[in-house]
Amino acid sequence: MIDESDPASTDPALDLFNQANGPAYAPEFVVKYREGQAARNHRITSWALEELARVRAAGFSDRAFTVHRTWADPRMVDPTLEPTKRPANLCYAGVPVKANRSTFGIGCATTLKNWLGMWSLSHAQTRAEPHLADVTVPALVINADGDTGVFPSDARRIYDALGATDKSQATIDADHYFQNPGARQAQADTIAEWASKRW
């Protein structure tokens, strides 16, 4: 987005849903797109810090605002990026282009403090990676191979960042919530087998 007050404001060169860009998305597009996402996040953070100072000076503790178009991961649209068993062109909220242009975005309704504490790339402490080195107990990371929002590289980054020396990874043929037949049983069996070898 170019203008946070206008959800229709888009840079065509960085529009995930502009057919001129893909899918399939060229590696150069994905790099520029990710840079654009990070730059947008930093712009919102800068505004949130300034706005928080402004409203506090006026006697308020916080204020609400909206962040549009957050269903925006290229992997949701282009299954050739990190191929898995996930359905093509699908996210948790349905077809990505429709989800992206709806009012049901991830973090769409937020506050200044919530943005800074949960979504800001430069301020939030909610990202797992910086803290996973402190996890030194035995750990099992399970990846669902049909997940439309969490991808194998996400699970791998979690696994790699863990401080545990005893750590394992497993992949199960499942969606994000392990709703497909047999998936929850497979998950339970995987956990039970892993735990039985340790305790």
Segments predicted by a language model, with ranges:
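Alpha/beta-hydrolase
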Residues: I2-P130
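Short, conserved loop/helix-junction motifs that constitute active-site signature segments
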Residues: L132-T136, A161-A164
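Catalytic active-site module of serine/aspartate enzymes centered on a nucleophile-bearing elbow/loop
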Residues: I172-W199
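Short beta-strand/loop motif that positions the catalytic acidic residue
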Residues: V135, V141-N143, D147
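Short, highly selective alpha-helical patches that border small-molecule cofactor pockets
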Residues: A155-Y159
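Conserved alpha/beta-hydrolase "acid-adjacent" motif
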Residues: T148-D154
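A cross-kingdom marker for long, charged
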Residues: W119-S120, A139, T190
